[in-house]
Amino acid sequence: MKIALLEPIGVSKEVIDELSAPITEKGHEFVYYDTKTTDPAELAKRSEGCDIVMIANNPYPTEVVEKADALKMLSVAFTGIDHIGTDKCKEKNIMICNAAGYSNQTVAELIIGMAIDALRHVVKADGLVRNGGTSAGLGGKEICGRTVGIIGLGQIGLMAAKLFQAFGAKVIAYSRSESEEAKALGIEYKSLEEVLSTSDIVSLNLPLNAETRGFLSADKIALMNENTIFINCARGPIVDNEALAKALNDGKLGYACVDVFDMEPPIPADYPLLQAKNTLLTPHQAFISEESMVRRAKIVFDNVTAYLDGKPVNVCKL
């Protein structure tokens, strides 16, 4: 079979060579493209004749899937698959396997870091020092004793909950299903309305799909109060980000830490959150660490090996 990795996945060429060796040793052809492209024509060209294609979070739209005549399987070095033309994959019986779980610790740690910055004004303090300022007026609060609301208690949400508990926070959660592990940890399940209205810190950790797109609408954002810290390291389109920016500018929401937007960075200059007050914005980096990139690469190659062995793993439901 012909197998192609269409873009870099955050590890060195040496790691790619090591991970691809079991594939080529079985007689399969492996091609690696070390540059990213979002051009559908170039993606189609790179996919030509490939039985298996490996991608990360670059779009792989319907028009590319349509032209990939030999394609049987997509191994995605990412958790979400909303950047792929999944309907066309389903129509063509193309299997998609993802890399769920590779970044749980990495994302959860950034969530904690964002909460600390929002409470202790770390970025603002850095700017003050560099401009001759002092700590006067910085103040700050502790995570300990705060109520943290987790919306979506999957693997990342649960990991974040454990870290918040380690700091001494009380954790409540809204989730589609309830976990015995979470209950054993003392996490209390509440209604969405109660989580939003009673939490000092709200962390959004839902996947993006047809049901969650636009989930956190203006009326739900309004349930949070003027002191609430809102953190989104999940997916941008889950939130009405224009309403989020308005709530911040109107003083109806305390602070927002956002790693994901309605588009991938670079973000257009007129995007509402860029003009919003009391924000910490990061360029979709929550999943990136040295450790998570190595885990991700291994999973995406293991997915290919398992498929070639007739025992596919991490198969996404389409």
Annotate the PLM regions.
Residues 1-50, 172:
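N-terminal glycine-/charge-rich "phosphate-binding" loop or analogous flexible N-terminal tail
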Residues 62-65, 178-272:
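Rossmann-like adenosine-cofactor binding region
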Residues 92-94, 100-147, 162, 166, ...:
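Phosphate-binding beta-alpha-beta segment of Rossmann-like dinucleotide-binding domains, i.e.
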Residues 96, 227-229, 233-318:
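Rossmann-like dinucleotide-binding domain for NAD(H)/NADP(H)
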Residues 153-154:
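Glycine-rich Rossmann-fold phosphate-binding loop(s) that bind the pyrophosphate
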Residues 157-158:
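N-terminal Rossmann-fold NAD(P) dinucleotide-binding loop
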Residues 166-183:
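NAD(P)-binding Rossmann-fold cofactor-contacting core
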